[in-house]
Amino acid sequence: MKLQEIKDFVKELRGLSQEELAKKENELKKELFDLRFQAAAGQLDQTARLNEVKKQIARVKTVQAETKE
């Protein structure tokens, strides 16, 4: 992801409720699980997508922590 895409993603996250953030986190975790499965089977072409999804999950958790305060 490029810097502007990251900023837009975080801006979008900040507009979501806690329930929507939890749903987004679950979707990303499911995608990460699927990507790991593909990587183990040797079918994953975009290996960088693994790290990208991990970082997106971290961003979601950060925004969740910000809004809980």
From Swiss-Prot:
GO terms for cellular component: cytosolic large ribosomal subunit. The gene is rpmC. It comes from Streptococcus mutans serotype c (strain ATCC 700610 / UA159). InterPro entries: Ribosomal_protein_uL29, Ribosomal_uL29, Ribosomal_uL29_CS, Ribosomal_uL29_sf. GO terms for molecular function: structural constituent of ribosome. This is Large ribosomal subunit protein uL29. Disulfide bonds: none annotated. Belongs to the universal ribosomal protein uL29 family. Gene3D superfamilies: 1.10.287.310.
